[in-house]
């Protein structure tokens, strides 16, 4: 029991320490297709390093029922059936792959994001487009397409935007997608 508590304490200290790391901006990153990718967690290669990136702020539908309760919660949020939700998860995975065909920028503190797999898994933000100053945030693109909900770990954005302000902007985009019936907000069978 004592070993378990020491291990748990060590892991929690590691998570806190990684949250204090400085932001790193990784340019020229590429999406690496992988069978376990989904819309909010996917493999990337930046320079010589490959890792799984978990987006801050958003949650895309699951692609299978491995996490059945989460998938049911997602379906309820969007007012959709489980089948439609799973199909939207598959669409989100393809949407991200297609959106990230060209090099993009990852902004990360390399804070550990728990998950299955052997590769490192870090929280981060993605700027789509070659120029970070002129690019668009992937989380915003996903929400506006109706393929993600505003949920998950939030963080103050480098450059000064507070987490609360960014999340509020995402909620406005989510309402816009809902009103326009985009993505999983669109009416469908079942």
Regions found by a protein language model. Give the residues of each.
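Sec-dependent N-terminal signal peptides
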Residues: 3-11
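Small beta-barrel nucleic-acid-binding modules, primarily SNase/OB-fold domains
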Residues: 13-190
């Amino acid at each position: 029991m004592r070993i378990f508590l020491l291990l748990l304490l060590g892991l929690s200290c590691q998570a806190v320490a990684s949250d204090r790391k400085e932001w790193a901006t990784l340019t020229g990153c590429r999406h690496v297709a992988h069978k376990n990718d989904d819309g909010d967690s996917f493999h990337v290669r930046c320079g010589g390093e490959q890792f799984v990136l978990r987006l801050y702020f958003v949650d895309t539908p699951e692609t299978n029922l491995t996490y059945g309760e989460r998938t049911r919660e997602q379906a309820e949020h969007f007012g959709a059936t489980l089948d439609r939700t799973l199909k939207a998860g598959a669409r989100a995975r393809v949407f991200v792959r297609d959106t990230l065909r060209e090099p993009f920028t990852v902004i990360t503190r390399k804070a550990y994001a728990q998950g299955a797999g052997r590769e490192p898994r870090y929280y981060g933000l993605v700027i789509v487009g070659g120029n970070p100053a002129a690019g668009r945030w992937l989380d915003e693109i996903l929400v506006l397409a109706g393929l993600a909900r505003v949920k998950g770990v939030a963080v103050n954005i480098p450059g000064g935007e507070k987490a609360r302000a960014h999340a509020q902007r995402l909620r406005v985009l989510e309402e816009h997608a809902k009103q326009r019936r985009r993505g999983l907000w669109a009416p469908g069978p079942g």
